């Protein structure tokens, strides 16, 4: 077996070599075209505007709301929880409800407030304030009312 036969057996044929050489040359010319810098054009940039340190009050005004509610039945507790989920503080007056229904609502809202990371505080007889995590309650006013409630429920 001659060396040329071995060479053609293991290496490319002359036609393949020519095709490879042609594709190599074509790649080289394409790369040169890509590497040529484009013509320089004059670009004008607008002058930078000074940064304004003004914050819209409307944004802050819309994000903080307090909802006043006076539910009559336990079935309204889910609507109150929806207000809390919407990041709105809620003041609930439970004086027009039976005590057992009011206790159930406070229990439900306590769980809701815990789940969203908020707070619930008593602000008067059968009146509570529930707040989401974006609202802080500072101070206490329950001392002004004293212990004049006539309910038998110790935790209220």
Swiss-Prot record:
Q: How does it assemble?
A: Homodimer. Interacts with FtsZ.
Q: Which gene encodes it?
A: sepF
> Which GO cellular component does the record give, naming just one?
cytoplasm
The record's section on Gene3D superfamilies has: SepF-like protein
Q: Does the keyword Cell cycle apply?
A: yes
Indicate yes or no for the key word DNA repair. Answer: no
Its localization reads:
Cytoplasm
**According to its UniProt record, which protein family does this protein belong to?**
Belongs to the SepF family.
Q: Which organism is it from?
A: Bacillus thuringiensis (strain Al Hakam)
| Region span, Disordered | 23-50
| Cystine pairings recorded for this chain | none
Relate the protein's function as given in its record: Cell division protein that is part of the divisome complex and is recruited early to the Z-ring. Probably stimulates Z-ring formation, perhaps through the cross-linking of FtsZ protofilaments. Its function overlaps with FtsA.
Q: Which InterPro entries match?
A: Cell_div_SepF, Cell_div_SepF/SepF-rel, SepF-like_sf
GO BP: division septum assembly; FtsZ-dependent cytokinesis
Q: Which UniProt keywords apply?
A: Cell cycle, Cell division, Cytoplasm, Septation
What is the protein name for this chain?
Cell division protein SepF
